[in-house]
Amino acid sequence: MLHFFLPKDLQPIFEYIPSSALHVVGWSSVLPSIITVGRRLAFDEGKHEMIGNLTPMLPPHVQFSTEHQHDHHDEHEHAEHAHTGLIHAEHIGDSVADKERFGVTVLEVFFSQLFSEAGFFIDLREHGFSLNSETVFWNPPNLWYHLDHNFRTGLIKVYDGYFFGPFSYAEEGLADLGILTEDHAANQKVVDLLLSHFGSDGERNVLFEIDPFAKSFDQFFSYLKEKNISLDANFMYFGLYLVTLYICLDKLKVPLDARTAFLNARNRLTKEKPDSQEEPAVS
């Protein structure tokens, strides 16, 4: 039933949201926001303002662009852009170096947007990106959402505690997300199910594959259902954001270092290191 309310651009993404999520997320609270997100897309509401808010958050070599459209491109257009040195990410070719550069850039964009108080563009799929030898251009569809402050900063704590420790910092983040339990082992399992595909301290470079991720995402929601933990609309939109990341990076088929991408975003966008146990400050 939910698919009837979804914007067309969201429907392929929702295919990777497991049915177990229906039992965990309160869909009655989600439906109004889906209508709002769909209206933004249909009428191009707020995109200019979002670009203005997010431009300072992006890595220095990434620029928003309305000139490099996210539609699928014909051969003539592809040839013209090849002549000028600009290629669409869908046609990135077989160069491992180019794939790594693009993939790490998308990861850093993913993490950078989590530091934005203003909201984030949901869709990181490759058809929104173009690149040349110096710059990655991004023209995302106008699918954006504003995460609640505590949820957003909780995500940052979870990633920080997972990548760098201590795990108690990740548990603080779980509390902000509303999924902290009294069982330390259960908290570890929740984090592992959600983040293990990002690699760990002992495994920096990992392949981002959509099918294994979708399986662990299902296990994540099933585990929360078993523990009678409920989630709200924030997690649904973050889940969609994760899915678009994996859809994009899955096509590259090269190992990527998410830990360093997070570190780069954190160092650019926070005034204090989180080991002070204070809430990260957004510049």
Predicted regions and their residues:
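Helix-rich C-lobe and terminal helical cap/extension of kinase-like folds
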Residues: 2-283
